[in-house]
Amino acid sequence: MNKHQRGFTLLEVMVAILLMSIVSLIAWRGLDSVTRTDARLRENTEQTESLLRAFNQLERDMALRASIEMQEPDLDGAQNDRPQAPAAVSLRAADTGEFRLDVIRSAAVSGEGLQRVRWWLKDGTLYRAMGLPSDRYPLPAPKEGVAVLGGVVDLQARIWKADNEWHTLDGNRENDPKGIEIRLTRETGQGREEYRKVVGLLD
């Protein structure tokens, strides 16, 4: 055995340490990149899911809108003298971002009557409120709203009319439109994203 076995020089040790540091830095940056990508994907997924939930709930409210339930039976033949039934769907919108949608729909539980639902936009958040179901008029007013969708920077709505064209409301109210188009712009981590939802055609 060679009693004078040669060891590592100081330079070799420093080079080895430097190489290990470089490898560790590359590995850390790779892990950090994966972590950031995963966080962005989770954020995008949550934003997409919240948008889908909002649109699905809106579509369900419209699908369950009242129709003949609000019409009193004509038992005495004096139909023309009876007060007109309230609109099942009432929309007010403007180019300034004003948006309010009122819906009278069937209650979630069959046999509980009708309930009022209201959607509106305030300070970049879309809210939804609903009143207690009832089988008597007047129906209870919607309670305190629940935030459904945040980050809304613009919301435009148009209605479909009998002339087969879309029309803006310019701040006016439209009752029982044939169809509703909603264009929504959100601020996300990837910038502004635009979405379009069409509900209808309504009977």
State what each model feature region is.
Residues 113, 139-142, 193:
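Residues that act as N-cap/strand-start positions at coil-to-secondary-structure junctions
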